[in-house]
């Protein structure tokens, strides 16, 4: 008990059972094994086995996933590519008597073990290190319920980094606490939906422009609220933005502008675009546990619902779904599929690889170019200027959304986020950073 740190009573109960053998401990170190033998205890032996060891501990926990105690993948890449990663055990075939004793050891036949295959990923350890540092800083600064960040190449969907808090060391999986294990091992980026708030306005803008229902020269008037179906819906700026053009509406994130955009398109046209962006179904990312966004049935949508959807309310999306769909807005209008696997190899032979063939066109290249210009203004002089870095071309949109509990708005609880894109030679990355329930007064996405 002293060697392994186990409770005396439960260990005594385990070894007192009437059975031929009992496993007392697994993954025993050489130091622990030496202490056992030095104690002179009789009837104790060990067997060697192979198991997963993660040299970087809690690095990439959610995306890598973990294995069961017998080596089978349970979550993340470990589960999704288990059929490739798991090898075949070796065997010795011999003739035995009725009680299982070998009759002729010389006539045994050995079947050698077959090693598992190698899965090459799109993950970048350098970018992952930066992201994990940023997540730790956000945890220390905002004391939130959770933090998540994903970085993806918006030109082809290759995921470069994914990090979430809370997390755990993959070498010390909390198997004894199933609630903790479930909450800390699942990827919220893949499996959890949330109300995106103003980051959703990227899609509304692109759809409105591409449909021809809105032009960049159109002017709008924001009085601080808009009445739809007899209900007053407020802009975040209580005094209103006044008379502004479309570009100023995007730059200042005016809710009234995006309500009008959605209403001009109408439910069917707007929903057709959202479907084309891929938001109404799973992205197809090669990780376990993915879910799809939640939308009101288009046949049940009222104008007041449509207006709210326009600025990111009355809708729920997954982070991976939002990043994938907005990537189409930035990359020239082509739909991408998020993925982590680059290729599967056996020695030098490629068994499987991810096809980078072009996806469906969602919006025109002209609309995409216009959106890039507008979103650069958001970062340069608008609501996202906190993300501005001199010498770099950065596009983006902030988001602050209220949370709901039991169907009601949870007062004082917010999800703050920033959705940004870098535009440079060889580094076309989209980044979605989410802070769940930041504490204190700094809860707006523009501050977080």
Question: Language-model features: where?
Answer:
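Small/polar-residue-rich segments within soluble enzyme cores
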Residues: 1-116, 433
């Amino acid at each position: 008990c002293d060697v392994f740190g186990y409770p005396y009573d439960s260990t005594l109960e385990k070894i007192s059972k009437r059975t031929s053998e009992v496993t007392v401990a697994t993954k025993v170190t050489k130091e622990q094994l030496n202490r056992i033998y030095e104690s002179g205890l009789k009837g104790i032996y060990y067997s060697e086995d192979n198991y997963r060891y993660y040299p970087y501990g809690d690095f990439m926990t959610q995306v890598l996933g973990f294995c069961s105690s017998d080596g089978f993948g349970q979550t993340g890449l470990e589960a999704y590519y288990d059929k490739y990663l798991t090898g075949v055990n070796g065997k010795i075939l011999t003739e035995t008597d009725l009680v299982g004793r070998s009759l002729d050891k010389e006539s045994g036949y050995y079947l050698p073990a077959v090693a598992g295959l190698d899965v090459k990923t799109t993950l970048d350890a350098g970018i992952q290190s930066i992201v994990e540092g940023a997540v730790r800083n956000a945890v220390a600064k905002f004391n939130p319920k959770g933090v998540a960040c994903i970085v993806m190449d918006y030109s082809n969907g290759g995921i470069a980094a994914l990090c979430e808090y809370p997390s755990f060391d993959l070498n010390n999986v909390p198997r004894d606490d199933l609630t903790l294990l479930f909450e800390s091992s699942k990827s919220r980026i893949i499996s959890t939906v949330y109300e995106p708030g103003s980051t959703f306005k990227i899609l509304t803008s692109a759809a409105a422009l591409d449909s021809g229902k809105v032009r960049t020269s159109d002017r709008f008037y924001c009085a601080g609220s808009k009445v739809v179906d007899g209900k007053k819906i407020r802009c975040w700026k209580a005094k209103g933005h006044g008379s502004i053009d479309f570009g100023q509406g995007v730059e200042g994130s005016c809710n009234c502008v995006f309500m009008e955009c959605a209403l001009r398109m109408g439910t069917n046209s707007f929903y057709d675009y959202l479907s084309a962006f891929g938001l109404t179904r799973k992205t197809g990312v090669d990780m376990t546990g993915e879910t799809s966004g939640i939308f009101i049935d288009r046949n049940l949508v009222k104008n007041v619902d449509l207006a709210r959807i326009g600025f990111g309310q009355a809708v729920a999306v997954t982070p991976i779904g939002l990043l994938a769909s907005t990537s189409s807005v930035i990359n020239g209008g082509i739909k991408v599929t998020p993925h982590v696997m680059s290729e599967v190899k056996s020695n030098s032979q490629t068994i499987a690889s991810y096809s980078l063939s072009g996806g469906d066109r969602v919006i025109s290249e002209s609309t995409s170019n216009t959106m890039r210009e507008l979103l650069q203004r958001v970062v340069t002089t608008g609501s996202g200027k906190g993300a501005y870095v001199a010498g770099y071309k950065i596009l983006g949109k902030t988001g602050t959304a209220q949370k709901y509990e039991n169907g009601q708005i949870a007062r004082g609880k917010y999800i703050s986020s920033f959705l940004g894109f870098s535009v440079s030679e060889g580094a076309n990355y989209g980044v979605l950073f989410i802070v769940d329930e930041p504490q204190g007064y700094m809860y707006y996405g523009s501050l977080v």
